[in-house]
């Protein structure tokens, strides 16, 4: 019994450490064009918001509008270089395909529904940088809510 409890404790600790590590990562840092887009926009990794900050919405209250815009421009740069955006326009089908490939989501998965809702919510925005950050923030927040609801189930 002690061994079983120890295994559960270790599993919980590893899961918590993994979630904490992911939330500390910078948004977009896992993608190929991250460094290129930082350079193109004269930013450093220190200028970019963390996943945890964005998924919780803290980036909106902790930073100035110019910082929000710059982060959005880096996101838009990466989306455009990956063929998911052209200017301020999404390629919605390609965005869904890439998201499914990246997350392993299956048809009917709530994450795909969240992506669709986020694209719909932001589709009429004209500023490509603000639009990109809002899309990323919307998806990350939805994923966090879904992860929390799945943990409670």
UniProtKB/Swiss-Prot annotation:
Species of the source: Solenopsis n. sp. (strain JP-2002)
Keywords assigned by UniProt, alphabetized: Behavior, Disulfide bond, Pheromone response, Pheromone-binding, Secreted, Signal, Transport
UniProt record similarity statement: Belongs to the PBP/GOBP family.
Keyword hit for Transmembrane helix: no
GO biological process: one example: response to pheromone
Predominant location: secreted
Subunit structure: Homodimer.
Signal peptide range in chain numbering: 1-19
Disulfide linkage: 37-77, 73-129, 118-138
InterPro entries (alphabetical): PBP/GOBP, PBP_GOBP_sf, Pheromone-bd_protein_Gp-9
Protein's recorded name: Pheromone-binding protein Gp-9
Sample GO molecular function, one term: pheromone binding
Function: Colony queen number, a major feature of social organization, is associated with worker genotype for Gp-9. Colonies are headed by either a single reproductive queen (monogyne form) or multiple queens (polygyne form). Differences in worker Gp-9 genotypes between social forms may cause differences in workers' abilities to recognize queens and regulate their numbers.
Location relative to the cell: Secreted
GO cellular component: extracellular space
Keyword flag Signal: yes
Pfam families, A to Z: PBP_GOBP
């Amino acid at each position: 019994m002690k061994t079983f409890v120890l295994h559960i404790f270790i599993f919980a600790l590893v899961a918590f450490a993994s979630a904490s590590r992911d939330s500390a990562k910078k948004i977009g840092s896992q993608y190929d064009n991250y460094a290129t887009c930082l350079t193109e926009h004269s930013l450093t990794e220190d200028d970019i918001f963390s996943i945890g900050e964005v998924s919780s919405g803290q980036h909106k209250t902790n930073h100035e509008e110019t910082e929000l815009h710059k982060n959005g421009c880096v996101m838009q740069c990466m989306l455009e270089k990956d063929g998911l955006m052209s200017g301020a326009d999404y390629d919605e089908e390609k965005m869904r395909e890439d998201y499914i490939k990246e997350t392993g989501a299956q048809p009917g998965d709530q994450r795909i529904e969240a992506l669709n809702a986020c694209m719909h919510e932001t589709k009429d925005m004209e500023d490509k940088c603000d639009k990109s950050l809002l899309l990323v923030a919307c998806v990350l927040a939805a994923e966090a809510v879904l992860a929390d609801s799945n943990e409670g189930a």
